[in-house]
Amino acid sequence: ETVHRVRLWGTDQAIAVSRSTADQMRAKWGARGVELVYNGVDIPEVHAAVEQQRVPAEGGPRILSLSRLSPEKGIDVLLDAFAQLRADYPQAHLEIAGSGDLASELQAQAQRLNLGDSVTFSGFVNPIEAMGRSDMIVQLSVWENCSYTLLDAKAAGLKTVATAVGGNPEILGADELVDRQSATLTQDVLQAMRAQLQKGKPEPFTWISNEQMAAQTVDIYARVLRGGR
């Protein structure tokens, strides 16, 4: 905590990638002069790249988790919710991409839930290819700043469910979010997945581009170099 505070007080300007991050920087470390510059995403390019990898669905909905296999990512909750989702969608499939300390534990959980080949642990993957064979991304992190995974998923036109933490509510709509602190988190995730799967095609996504992000950052640097804030 002290190190972060000293670093921030020794800078001429701080940049946060979400309003939530900016608020935390001010509240926890007394940061001054914090400006918001969201992570950018080039929506047409991402959408086109994913469409080039698009694999038509042959069965039920295809759910994707694209994160580290570590406790703060909530993949155990996703497995429990997915096991119940199969009552509505027996042909549903869950791909858990990524690696981490919980790999063996999560695989054992999938076995206990009798999920069989409805779950694939795919390890390290090309995220564009993984999104091309998926219909929905679920991300149940304890904390996020401005998630590139969610930005890319929205740009690609995938359905999304995520925890209402960090910058996630600045990217997603209320019906795509669940309360990470809820005592009924598994059921909340299940209901959110059901609701998203029952909806039609997602609304067009708008966000700042990489070029806009770079321009905003350059503008901040230029003002600092001129001696202004």
Residue map of PLM features:
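A conserved mid-protein helix/loop that constitutes part of the nucleotide-sugar donor-binding site
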Residues: 61-84, 94, 101-107
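Active-site donor-binding acidic/aromatic loop of nucleotide-activated sugar
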Residues: 102-105, 116-124, 130
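A charged, aromatic-enriched C-terminal amphipathic alpha-helix characteristic of glycosyltransferases
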Residues: 184, 197-226
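Membrane-proximal helix-turn-helix segments that form the acceptor-binding/catalytic region
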Residues: 1-14
